Regions:
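Charge-dense polyanion-binding interfaces
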Residues: 81-98, 156-160, 243
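Post-BTB helical module
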Residues: 101-203, 210, 231, 235-239
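Eukaryote-biased feature marking scaffold/signaling PDZ-domain proteins and nuclear chromatin regulators
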Residues: 44-46, 53-55, 60, 67, ...
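Signature of small Cys/His-rich zinc-finger-like modules used by ubiquitin/SUMO E3 ligases
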Residues: 7, 161, 182, 186, ...
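Alpha-helical oligomerization interface recognition
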Residues: 44, 48-85, 99-104, 132-139, ...
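N-terminal BTB/POZ boundary and linker segment
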Residues: 2-63, 97, 101-116
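Hydrophobic, mid-to-C-terminal alpha-helical segments
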Residues: 217-229, 235
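Acidic, low-complexity intrinsically disordered termini and linkers
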Residues: 5, 234-281
Length: 281
């Protein structure tokens, strides 16, 4: 059977922007309160709790927090936490800036913040279980996926998947799949592939949709990852089984692949012989 071939990149790549100006992003999709309620909140009137995040205090209303956040609903309704529930202190993956945006979202159904805080807001929405904000943040991040952030977004999505919600769409999984598709299309341009996980690199290299300029480029990326992460030999060989050595030039096989120290083992040479055998059979 002929070896499978990957898609090839075109000779021109997407332009990259060097603009470092701060951009404000607006997320919407929530339910806005009547203007009078928002006015009372902004003036700090009739609040009955204080939420502390990273040393900052946010005057709030328990009813509003509990009605929009499953986390706070559980927190304030838990009798065993009654003593400490009055004025909660948030820890974990919630920054003060992200909570400020989330708090506004609960009242106004939308929030605006520095675009660089997008992943923080997504983490906060996921942790505090504010599903409409999480949905909006995932959609915004998907629109901004690029070779420079695809792997980081994929990793973030995998981390967020630890908080499943069976009643709703699996938003972290949706983000992970979109990030994977971006990585497949832009494999040659990916930033810091050596920071990826073994599972991610395995999924990319094994996928026929992976677009690369050559199989030599695929091997080089795998080699950078392996040299950085030093996986166990069995894991490395399992990963390399998805590299299509028969599509490489003889000179690259001889000068680069065969001389790569991480393949200079009995098992490594055995795998290489096995993988290039179809070429000479």
């Amino acid at each position: 059977m002929a070896p499978r071939k990957r898609a090839r990149t075109s000779s021109t790549g997407g332009a990259s922007s060097s603009d470092t100006s701060v951009t404000t992003i607006k997320l919407s999709g929530g339910e806005s309160c009547p203007s009078g309620v928002v006015e009372l909140w902004r003036s700090g009137q009739l609040t009955d709790t204080v939420v502390t995040v990273e040393g900052r205090s946010f005057a709030a209303v328990k009813f509003m927090l509990a009605s929009g956040s499953d986390y706070f609903r559980c927190h304030f309704n838990n009798e065993q936490m009654a003593v400490g529930a009055a004025n909660p202190t948030l820890q974990g993956p919630v920054s003060a800036a992200a909570f400020e945006a989330l708090h506004s979202f609960l009242y106004e159904g939308e929030c605006s913040f520095d675009e660089t805080r997008l992943t923080e807001v997504l983490q906060a929405a996921n942790y505090l279980q504010v599903k409409p904000l999480e949905r909006a943040a995932v959609a915004a991040l998907k629109e901004r996926l690029s070779p420079s952030n695809a792997l980081a977004a994929w990793t973030l999505a995998d981390q967020l998947s630890g908080t499943p919600d069976l009643a709703e769409e699996p938003l972290p999984e949706e983000l992970a799949e979109a990030a994977k598709e971006t990585a497949l299309k832009c494999f040659d341009e990916l930033d810091l592939v050596e920071h990826a996980t073994l599972k991610q690199v395995q999924a990319l290299v094994a996928d026929d949709r992976l677009t690369a300029k050559s199989e030599e480029a695929v091997f080089s990326a795998v080699a950078r990852f392996a040299e950085a992460k030093q996986p166990a030999e069995a894991e490395l060989l399992g990963l390399l089984r998805n590299v299509r050595f028969v599509q490489m030039s003889p000179s690259f096989l001889h000068d680069t692949v065969r001389s790569w120290p991480m393949l200079d083992t009995r098992a490594g040479q055995g795998l290489l012989f096995e993988m290039v055998a179809p070429r000479v059979s």
